[in-house]
């Protein structure tokens, strides 16, 4: 109960409005961006970088450095997000790290700070995948775009004899999905 004469600070009714053409997840130097075309106006993308939080994904070695898949996938996903935004698309960044931003170092330090849009990422793989798909499905139902696609970025560790560049997964019985 409230007491007379005591000052209380109330939380805001909604989160602070985000600046136009500004995404702090890109890092201080790249947070502001310009929309340079309307090529993707009306398109909405749900971007997910592989693994994250308690799961670093594949771990490679280069000299004395460990290369953690989740860090490189996250960096690639942020670059893709920025590119899509500059071309007029709506972009939802599902896996987020408020500190990393887009990085230009050859070796990216591993962290476990990533969240699923603010929620901690579960260790259990099934729960982790369900969390991501639930978040995308919720946003998908709210978004009123004609063109909506989810893109999952992974950077798998392969030996030179078995390198595969890109995998596309789609719904078998959906001609639009096959066309993509």
Predicted features along the sequence, with ranges:
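A broad, low-specificity signal marking well-ordered, structured residues that form hydrophobic/aromatic
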Residues: 8, 45, 166
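Active-site-proximal helix/loop segments of hydrolytic enzymes
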Residues: 37, 67-180
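Short, functionally critical alpha-helical segments immediately adjacent to catalytic or ligand/cofactor-binding
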Residues: 1, 5, 47, 151-153
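Boundary/activation segment at the start of structured domains
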Residues: 14-59, 65, 78-79
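Extracellular LysM carbohydrate-binding repeats and other cell-envelope/extracellular binding modules
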Residues: 1-21
């Amino acid at each position: 109960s409230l007491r007379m004469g005591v000052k209380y600070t109330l939380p805001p009714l909604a989160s602070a409005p985000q600046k136009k053409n500004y995404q702090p997840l890109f890092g201080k130097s790249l947070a502001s961006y310009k929309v340079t075309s309307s090529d993707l106006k009306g398109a909405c993308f749900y971007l997910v970088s592989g693994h994250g939080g308690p799961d670093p994904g594949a771990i490679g070695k280069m000299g004395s450095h460990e290369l953690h898949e989740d860090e490189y996938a996250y960096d690639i996903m942020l670059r893709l997000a920025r590119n899509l935004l500059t071309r007029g698309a709506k972009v939802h960044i599902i896996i987020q790290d408020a500190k990393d931003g887009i990085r230009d170092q050859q070796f990216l330090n591993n962290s476990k700070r990533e969240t699923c849009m603010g929620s901690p990422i579960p260790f259990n793989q099934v729960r982790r995948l369900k969390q991501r798909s639930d978040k995308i499905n919720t946003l998908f139902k709210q978004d009123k775009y004609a063109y909506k696609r989810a893109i999952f970025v992974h950077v798998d560790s392969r030996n030179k004899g078995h390198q595969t560049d890109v995998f596309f997964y789609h719904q078998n019985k959906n001609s639009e999905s096959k066309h993509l």
